[in-house]
Amino acid sequence: MIYTDFQGEKISQLGMGTMRLPVVDGDNANIDEAAALEMFDYAYKHGINYFDTAWGYHDGNAELVTGKALSRYPRESFHLTTKFPGYDRNHFPKVKEIFAKQLEKLQTEYFDFYLFHNVCEYNIENYLNPAFGVKEYLVSERAAGRIKHLGYS
């Protein structure tokens, strides 16, 4: 595996995304957990240490399976990315609740990378709107150590 140094961290140049995990009977919400866990094991054992997921992948179940898979490895041995679901305007008032649920689903105390998801002209005002406090809250989580790197996708 080829690695890149990112601010003192060794990150694999190839990562594993969870937007399209194997499913049962074509049902996007019904992840074939055994097959997915095999994929995680294969990736990890072959040096992949960057894993990317998001709130909405597989109707919310990708974070659960990712958490289950990665909980079997030492937390400091991989880099975990997830995202705030800004593609749905109804999520903005729930930033604290969603963030807490993501920590729980992913069975972690912190995220290496946390991204404002799908930033575009449709939702940029909501991300920056002080009434929702999304930016402010996530910056405070970074200061508290629950987010190492904050960005956008």
Question: What positions do the PLM features span?
Answer:
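Structural detector of well-ordered beta-strand residues that form the stable sheet scaffold
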Residues: 51, 80-81, 148-153
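N-terminal binding-site loop/beta-alpha segment at the start of enzyme catalytic domains
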Residues: 1-78, 137, 143
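Secondary-structure boundary/capping residues
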Residues: 75-79, 89, 111
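Glycine/proline-rich, positively charged
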Residues: 90-153
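Acidic-and-aromatic substrate-binding clefts and catalytic sites of carbohydrate-active enzymes
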Residues: 54-63, 87-93, 122-123
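Active-site beta-loop-alpha junctions enriched in small/polar residues
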Residues: 19-21, 54-56, 83-87, 116-119, ...
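Active-site mouth loops of central-metabolism enzymes
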Residues: 20-34, 83-93, 125-127
